Amino acid sequence: MKVITTAPTERVMTKSIPIEQVAAFAEGPFQGNPAAVCPLQTWLPDSLMQAIAAENNLSETAFYVGSEGRYQLRWFTPRCEVDLCGHATLAAGHVVFQREPHLETVEFSSNSGPLMVRRLGDQLTLNFPVQPAYPCPVPDRLEAVLGSTPEACLMGVDLMVVLADECQVAALAPDSAAVAELPGRGLIVTASATEVDFVSRFFAPSCGIAEDPVTGSAHCSLTPYWAKRLNRSDLLARQLSARGGMLRCQLTEERVLISGRVIPYLSGVIHLDC
């Protein structure tokens, strides 16, 4: 995680920047996880991209540079740059497909390696690396944060805890300051479910996100865990945030395929006084 000051210190020649806002993993309007996407000709200064992300005040803003289906991609929360973001990658893929409708596959290079987005009908599919999580001792203060004792606790990029049932996941209302003191990028809370295979929620206050509506990257850890526990590789997941979101997940060796719908919300231009 790289924290960048939100006050731009460099002047640029760009006077306007296109911006799209779309909801990833959405089943309808005002659902899923909204992300802003800014297609660029060349990279802006880091401080300016961070300032734009802070002004957007969405969980992530994606910026990409490139053409003809091959791009470089970066993601910024309102507070910092992150190395991987699933929903904003799905959103960026949607924007590329709208601008280059002849494409069926988009390849992004990123700090987490190559990332692919494919489209099939109204579904887009991410091809992401597995982010394994391993059993670990229960951190101090975790039970106080959860208000219960977890069935399992694992550590990877994020701290992942398994609760007894989906009702406990839905009812969780953790204190953001307490969550920020836990190890890892954020806190994944998950449980098995009845209408889908598993449910989850994701909290990352240290990245400026009290709760993420739908978190594609968290499913890079959730999918291998539940695939092993349920003994199957194709899974249906729901994230139980207020907006909610549905994800279809498939484990294929060391990669996770994560599919969902994208619903566009707005198109516009960012105007800058340079």
Residue ranges and their predicted role:
Residues K2-T6, E10-C85, T89-C274:
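Active-site proximal loop and beta-alpha junction motif in alpha/beta enzyme cores
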